[in-house]
Amino acid sequence: MTTTLTPPSSRREDGDGSVQVHQDASLKIEEGALVIAVYGKGGIGKSTTSSNLSAAFSKLGKRVLQIGCDPKHDSTFTLTHKMVPTVIDILEEVDFHSEELQPEDFVFEGFNGVMCVESGGPPAGTGCGGYVTGQTVKLLKEHHLLEDTDVVIFDVLGDVVCGGFAAPLQHANYCLIVTANDFDSIFAMNRIVQAIQAKAKNYKVRLGGVVANRSAETDQIDKFNERTGLRTMAHFRDVDAIRRSRLKKCTIFEMDKDEEGVEAVQNEYLLLAQNMLDHVEPLEAESLKDREIFDLLGFD
């Protein structure tokens, strides 16, 4: 079987009539796996959250696959302790003849058995990164690498909600949105809610909730949640050990528990993972208009 990159369909069936990358029915991830797409404003800590959440699931005995969906391919380095080659780079080496590849060419084992894939993407300003994500899922299925997986986490580029980078929503059961307690992060979160509302018309994805990150307080997030119907699933304060874990190229679970804040962060990730496994009730949130967010947030 050969993976061939072909132009994505321009059918207008999804969301509000936008041109989007559509899921081939054959690419559906097997029922039984918990599939989570992690979104949020660029630089908010999605890769940190995704990797530590993957590690937490593995600590609970689950078989985990994390798929980095960013051309920077830096999603999984705290799990693998290195920058791994991307799927698109490996495919280019074999002129996109996927039958020449072995799983070990593009899937790398990380901390506590977490399997890691970096989809990569086209050069800046060209192509569709979301379509590359679709090809990554296709390649994983060709090699039967999704059949024995309990949890799949898509770590998605920034807050881009075009048809391409909304593609992981087509595979996901739940979307988690990482945000801080500030206007820009919450504004981006609202746009992501809009994208999920569009995808939920045709796909199974639903909102799982919000991860408050690098925030001492959550008052602004709480305001937004109350108005839209969202909920906060986990709260991570600005703990220096998290920053240092990135510099050490490891997950928070590899840091010394005696360091300040480490054990509390580990426990919060384990609680988040367990709550997601317990089939969290999906949310029917309603996004706000831009002006409504502007008027809602801030101090009296």
From Swiss-Prot:
The family assignment reads: Belongs to the NifH/BchL/ChlL family.
Q: Which HAMAP family does the annotation name?
A: ChlL_BchL
Protein's UniProt name: Light-independent protochlorophyllide reductase iron-sulfur ATP-binding protein
Its biological purpose is as follows: Component of the dark-operative protochlorophyllide reductase (DPOR) that uses Mg-ATP and reduced ferredoxin to reduce ring D of protochlorophyllide (Pchlide) to form chlorophyllide a (Chlide). This reaction is light-independent. The L component serves as a unique electron donor to the NB-component of the complex, and binds Mg-ATP.
Oligomer and partners: Homodimer. Protochlorophyllide reductase is composed of three subunits; ChlL, ChlN and ChlB.
Keyword entries, A-Z: 4Fe-4S, ATP-binding, Chlorophyll biosynthesis, Iron, Iron-sulfur, Magnesium, Metal-binding, Nucleotide-binding, Oxidoreductase, Photosynthesis
- UniProt catalytic activity: chlorophyllide a + oxidized 2[4Fe-4S]-[ferredoxin] + 2 ADP + 2 phosphate = protochlorophyllide a + reduced 2[4Fe-4S]-[ferredoxin] + 2 ATP + 2 H2O
- Coiled-coil spans are none
Tagged with keyword NADP: no
**Cross-referenced CDD domains:** Bchl-like
Enzyme superclass (EC): oxidoreductase
Q: Which NCBIfam families match?
A: DPOR_bchL
Which residues take part in binding [4Fe-4S] cluster? 128, 162
**Tell me, which GO biological process terms does this entry list?**
light-independent chlorophyll biosynthetic process; photosynthesis, dark reaction
Residues that, per the record, bind ATP:
43-48, 72, 213-214
List the Gene Ontology MF annotations in alphabetical order: 4 iron, 4 sulfur cluster binding; ATP binding; metal ion binding; oxidoreductase activity, acting on iron-sulfur proteins as donors; oxidoreductase activity, acting on the CH-CH group of donors, iron-sulfur protein as acceptor
Q: Which cofactor does it need?
A: [4Fe-4S] cluster
